[in-house]
């Protein structure tokens, strides 16, 4: 079920338009765990693919949540390698809907 998180960040008030509500799906308790962001190109070379998958897998096994935008390429590889249940996706969805449907999601997803 999609739920909302109401939040207030004073620094955002200087902007004309900013999100006042975040929508999320999944395990909110993942936000309390150690996190690292893995993002990168949508068209990685083979070396980058291998390195991203190995890094995400090892960090996930160590209890670190992988935070990424969920886009195709490096972002999606990181989520897949982390086993998805230990990942957090932060996204403003547009053209990456297909990537989300490819992943058997069991972690935490938020969008504004």
What label would you give each PLM region?
Residues 2-112:
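Glycine-biased, small-residue-rich flexible motifs in mid-sequence functional cores and linkers
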